[in-house]
Amino acid sequence: DVYKRQVVTYQTAYLKKYYPKEFLAGVLNNRIDKIDEIAKYVVYMKEKNIAVYPPDVNKSKAYFSVQGDGLRFGLCALRGVGIGAMEKVIEEREKNGLFKDFPDFLMRCIRFLNKKMVESLIFGGAFDSMGKRRSQYEAVYEDLMKRLAAIDKQKMSAQMSLFGDIIQEEAPKANYPDIPEWDTTEKLSREKSVLGVYVSGHPFGAYAAHFTDCNFHTGLLADYEEDEETGDRTYHQIKIDDKVTMGGIVAAVRKINTKSGTIMAFITIEDLYGSVECVAFPRIYDKIKSCLLYTSDAADEL
């Protein structure tokens, strides 16, 4: 057993050093249905300057894959899509070629997709390369799916008909409204809701340059013992009772009434590396509560 563990440790170290992207792809694919763990390793990749590419119906495989200088999200990694359905999407693309546009995708995949799956793909940016805005895809997908479901039903009936009715073979055109993209906060929030992490940007990104003198960020919260997958050991010099400063956005505030009738709060702060929950006891909460009225596009130093 000791010998086997040593062999595994050596193999892990070798792969991590010489094939880091392939190694991490394997790690992520072992956790393809655990979105919180995927988020942890995506943050790790960003720290190691390994590019993370968003899902794309014409470029992604079912699982995470190495592409260029980084890894691309697999379609199966999105929350709410279903592994079986995404494998069928990949199979359709490999058999009949790239999807020409959004209606073409829906027409060819309508039999194994539902509205929630399509919505998740939109939120995750899987159609961005097709040239329209996510807000436009969201505006038309339900109507398109209804029309395509009716066409598909006609096709099924025609196959059973003696007369072989002529049925529309081309995808119907989408009537995209001329509307702006969602604002940055909403776009990134929806993206994170299905990917577990921000990929195309970060709501704190516009403010990060103003916080370079802070002595703490959430990347320092990595495990201090050796990580079983990456083999890394992480240590830092911040000690208990040290004063720390960090820059981040207020992502969530959970207020609690204390026994004495005062209010304290648990505040989730997000920065470019991840998130951390801070505790504001009643005296501190009373001082900062006015700052917590901002939405997540406001940066606060705590």
Report each predicted region and the residues it spans.
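Noncatalytic, beta-rich nucleic-acid-contacting surfaces in large DNA/RNA-processing enzymes
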Residues: 4-296
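A short, hydrophobic C-terminal helix/tail in secreted or cell-surface proteins
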Residues: 297-302
